[in-house]
Amino acid sequence: MRNIVVGSRRSKLALTQTKWVINELKQLGAPFTFEVKEIVTKGDRVLDVTLSKVGGKGLFVKEIEHELLAGGIDMAVHSMKDMPAVLPEGLVIGAVSRREDARDVLVSKGNRMLSDLPPGSVIGTSSLRRSAQLLAYRPDLTIKWIRGNIDTRLAKLESEEYDAIVLAAAGLARMGWGDDVISDYLPFDVCVPAVGQGALAVECREDDDELRQWLSRLNDEQTERAVRAERAFLQQMEGGCQVPIAGYAEVKEGTVRLTALVASPDGKEMYKEIVTGADPEAVGRQAAAILSEQGAKALIERVKKELGD
């Protein structure tokens, strides 16, 4: 029986997600044994600065992809939102999991909702996408950067000068947390999620036909179509972690509906559009073209220049 080595980041969430995928493959009857190999990524190592300052793309996946290409592992489980828009040659996404709740959530002291937070409240996030949209909605809030895994951030909320933190609903759900810690679910019109948020990507080598065959059975077609639209938009906009870019698509009766957003880090400049169509990639490209024409592309170039990228 073939042994499949599965690459994963070391965080509790990453390992939980990896074990979930392995379990699903076992349930499907995949004729493999599995072994998890923990890999430390650049994004895990550099914790004292924001992701936008770490720079580059694929901060949480690059080292794992190197292992895949070198044959050190056979597949890898990622949060789809960590995946760069373009994969290295020789690698493919073999499966996209059914999407969990894609929304961002607020966890606050005193269980206050976003609209109830007093002016000047300090919000912890490590994401420019979240901070830009929060500031656009509530310019009177103060953003303070926070890094680390979910456990670390929840501990920092209790012990440090934060009134609330923003996290992904899906990550909390996978860790077994829900309404017991969540104070407010942020609606999409307040905070558009990251591209791929709530879904998992299982990456493998393009030429591994046997593994790909089993991964295809794990694939959720509806989620995959939605994510393809989001990633096509992301690819056209060419933004890494340095620019607030968001995209969320839903598929209903064969039609893809994509909400796409590009903003300035301070939230004062924002471009947002809803595009629908049958072809996911075409919808993503169309959204990018519309926003670019409105001024989003120029904004991205300006932000990159300011950050010295």
From Swiss-Prot:
Keywords: Porphyrin biosynthesis, Transferase. PROSITE patterns: PORPHOBILINOGEN_DEAM. GO terms for molecular function: hydroxymethylbilane synthase activity. The keyword Hydrolase does not apply. Binds 1 dipyrromethane group covalently. Its EC number is 2.5.1.61. InterPro entries: HemC, Porphobilin_deaminase_cofac_BS, Porphobilin_deaminase_N, Porphobilinogen_deaminase_C, Porphobilinogen_deaminase_C_sf. The modification S-(dipyrrolylmethanemethyl)cysteine is found at C241. GO terms for cellular component: cytoplasm. GO terms for biological process: protoporphyrinogen IX biosynthetic process. It catalyses: 4 porphobilinogen + H2O = hydroxymethylbilane + 4 NH4(+). Disulfide bonds: none annotated. Pathway: Porphyrin-containing compound metabolism; protoporphyrin-IX biosynthesis; coproporphyrinogen-III from 5-aminolevulinate: step 2/4. Belongs to the HMBS family. Monomer. This is Porphobilinogen deaminase.
